[in-house]
Amino acid sequence: MIGKSEEEINAQKELKKQEKIKKKEERRKEIQEAAKRRNHQAEAAEEAALKLGRKNKKEWFLNPYYLTFGGLFLVLIYIIVMLFMNRQTPLNKIPVLDETRFFEHNSGSNWKQSDCKFWEGQTLADAKRLMSTSFASHSNLNKCFIEGSEEIPESFDIRENNKECKLGVVDQNKKCAGSYATAIASTLAEKLCMESDEKKLTPLSAQELLSCDTANKGCRGGYVNNALEYTVLRGLATEECLPFKGTFDAKCSEMCAEPMKVRPESFCVLFGDNDIKREIMKNGPVVSSMEVYTDFLSYQKGVYTKGEDVPKFSGFHTIKIVGWGVEDGSEDEPNKGNKYWIIENSWGEDWGENGYAKISEGQNLFFEQYAYSIMTKKQTEEMRQSIERKQKAAAEAQQQQQKTNDVPDMNLDDDDVNNKNP
C-alpha cells in the first residue's frame, strides 16, 4: 500500500476544515433563526398582553358594580359641594327683626315691614317653635249648614257693627305656642256678647285650654278641634277666675267651679271662602289656622302677599277671621282692586295694623280653605230650624212632583181618538 502523499493529506485537512466552517455557519444561522422566532413570539405575546390589558380595562370600566358605586360616589361629591356652596345660616342666628331687610323690602313692595315689641330679641328658631298648631282629619267633623244665597258684599268688617263686643288684641307669651287657645276663648266670648241683649262682654280663659286640656300639649301646641271639643264638653272659666299666663308650668286650677264655666253648644267646619264670609256676616268671627312665611312676622301695614323664595314654617298659626275687603288704591296702598281678608292675630297691638292684618286672597295659606264656627245655643237652634225648613221644602217639592206625575194625560192625539171610536 502506497502511502498518501503530503498533498492529499493537506487536501483532506482543508476539506475537514471547510466542513467545520460550514457546520459552524449552519449552526449560527440556526441560532439566528431561533432568536428571530423567539423575538417574534415575544413581540406577539407582548401585543397580545397589551390587547388583553385594554380589553380588561374596558370591561372593568363597564362593570355594573363599579359603575353603580362610581355613580354614587360622584353624587355624594356633588351633594357635598352644593351644601358647601349653599350653606344657610342656622335659624337661631337669624333675628326676626332686621332693619336692613326691612329697608330692602319696603323700597319695592306695596305692603310694609317694621319692628314690633313681640319679636324683640327673637330669632327665627324662636318663631318656629310658636307655629305648632296641628290638624286632624275633618272627615268625622260636622259641616256647617249655611242657609241663604244672599249676595256677599265687597267688604265687611265685624268690628264696625260690634264695637261693644270687641276684646282687645291678645298679646300671647313669646315662649308659648298657644294661639289656638287664645283664638277660641276670645271668639266664644265675643259671639256670646253679640247674641246677648245687654251686649255684655265677659272675657274667657284661654289658660284653661293650655293647662287643663290633656288632649293637647299646652304651650307646646295642639289641635284646634281637640281644644274645641274640650270647650264644648267642659266649658271655659272666665279670664278673671283663671287669668292668662302663657307659661309651661301653669297648673290646671280646680278653683273655678263648673257653674262658672261657659260652654258653646257645638262647633262645625266651614269649607270655602263663601261659606266663611256668610258665617262671619251672620254669626261673627271664625277660627282658622294659616301657614306662616318668615316675612309675615314683621308685617306692619298694607295687603300682605307672601314674597318669592321666602321660606315658610312647618307648622301652623291659629288666627281669627273678622272680615274682608278690597283695596281702594290710596297713596299708601296702591294695589287697587286687590281683595283681602282681615285677620286678628295674637302678637299684641304693636304688631301689624293694631294687631290685625290684611292678607291677599287666593294665596293658598290654608286659612281660607276651611275654618271653624263655634256654635252657641242660639246659633245651634237657628241652624236646626233652618235644616228643618229646608227638609220640609224638599219634601213638599217631592210631593208636588209626585202629584204631577200621577195626573192622567188628557191631551190625546188623533190615533188615540180613532182607537177609542167604534
Model-found features: residue ranges?
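Low-complexity, intrinsically disordered tandem-repeat tracts enriched in small/polar residues
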Residues: K29-A35, A42-A49, A395-Q398, D415-K420
